C-alpha cells in the first residue's frame, strides 16, 4: 500500500492507495503545534477505524506547501510503519522527483509543488488545454497547454480570506 499526503496551509489530505487505486481518503487540520507522535496517533486511529493494516504500507509520497509539517509527517510515518519498512518516503521538491512537466514560466521556483501536481493530474485525466482551479486556502488558477506543459497561473484570495 502507498500512503500519500497533500499538506496544505489549512488541511492535510491523506490517501491510501492499493494496486494504484485510492481506497481511503481523510482530511486533518494542518497544525504546526502538533508533534510527530500526535500525527502518528491520528493516522493509526484513522487506519484502525477503516481496518487498514499500517504494517502493509510499503511507501509514502508527500506533497507540501508547509515545510514544518513536512518534517513532522516524515517522522510520524517512521513511528507507525513496521521496522521492516523498506519503502521510501518521497517528498516532492526535495528528493529530485522528476515530475516530467515543462514549466513555461520565467521563474520556475515560484510555482508551488501543489500547483504543479494539480496540473499533471489534470492533464493525465483530461488531456491538454486546461484551466485548473483549486479552491484551497488561496484560490489558484493554472493553465496547462495541449501537450501538458504548464503555461502559468494566478493566485487569488481563498473563499475564507
Named regions from a protein language model:
Residues 18, 45, 75, 79, ...:
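Short, well-ordered alpha-helices that flank and scaffold nucleotide-derived cofactor binding pockets
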Amino acid at each position: 500500500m502507498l500512503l500519500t499526503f497533500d499538506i496544505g496551509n489549512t488541511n492535510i489530505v491523506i490517501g491510501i492507495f492499493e494496486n494504484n487505486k485510492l481506497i481511503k481518503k481523510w482530511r486533518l487540520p494542518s497544525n504546526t503545534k502538533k508533534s510527530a507522535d500526535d500525527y502518528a496517533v491520528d493516522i493509526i486511529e484513522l487506519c484502525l477505524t477503516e481496518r487498514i493494516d499500517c504494517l502493509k504500507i510499503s511507501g509514502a509520497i508527500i506533497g507540501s506547501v508547509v515545510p514544518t509539517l513536512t518534517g513532522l509527517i516524515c517522522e510520524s510515518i517512521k513511528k507507525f510503519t513496521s521496522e521492516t519498512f523498506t519503502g521510501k518516503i518521497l517528498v516532492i521538491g526535495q528528493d529530485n522527483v522528476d515530475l516530467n512537466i515543462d514549466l513555461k514560466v520565467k521563474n520556475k521556483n515560484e510555482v508551488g509543488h501543489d500547483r504543479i501536481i494539480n496540473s499533471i493530474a489534470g492533464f493525465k485525466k483530461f488531456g491538454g488545454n486546461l484551466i485548473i482551479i483549486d479552491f484551497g486556502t488561496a484560490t489558484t488558477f493554472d493553465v496547462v497547454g495541449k501537450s501538458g506543459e504548464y503555461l502559468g497561473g494566478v493566485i487569488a484570495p481563498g473563499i475564507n480570506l
